[in-house]
Amino acid sequence: VDREDLEQLVDLSVVCTVSSVDTGLALNAVAENRSTVAEAHIQVDTGLGFGGFLISEPEKILLAYRSLPNVALSGIYTQLHAVTGKSQEVDGQLGQFQQVLEAIHQAGFETGTVHAAGSFALMHFDDARLDAVRAGSAILGRCRRTKGDGLTTVGYGEASITEVRWLPKGHTVGADKLIAMKKPTRVAVLPVGYQNGFGVERPRSQSLLELWRAWRRSRNRTVRLNGQRVRVIGSIGASETILNV
């Protein structure tokens, strides 16, 4: 753990994560040196593997509650992982997490705010909505989805064309894979690209069928121009897209 980063987090009163005894001790030392108390949540690993106390080592979690006088442990969380949206995928993880919570309570400590659901779990598993949820990719509009999830389009983006011109037969366009014009073509430049989120999507699953469908959609992408659908030519660039007008 970088001490300078911890010092800045403590100075800004950021709610930190304690994912191990070592990170807890490091945060406690910084807070003690500044004569303050840092706020943090305990992270528990129920199988995702990104970090946190292992569920098989509850004694280490209890050590964090007992040994960090300058850290106020105001919450505890895990990150549920699921693929299909079926409840049995997360039932076991929630059960393991609940066992950790019970061990903490039996030792006489309060868990504070308990949370386990990211965006996918938030939308698919009612039991995962505990004291709080962490809606990240759902807010960005790029959350992994399942069929029949009830989500509907709530808006659209608008941009002005920056240039219209003719390209001769044989001229190429595209950011990644060049496409040659088969005939003289009138094109327009749209000042929007993948850095704006255009064309960025997550398949509903990683199955070959869903990946193939996503590939087909990318080859037939359109935008609406003056009430008419026009096709995108070539791959979408970082900040520009070419339209066939």
List PLM regions with ranges.
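Active-site-proximal beta-alpha core segment in soluble small-molecule metabolic enzymes
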Residues: 1-116, 129
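Active-site anion/phosphate-binding pocket segments in diverse small-molecule metabolic enzymes
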Residues: 20-22, 92-245
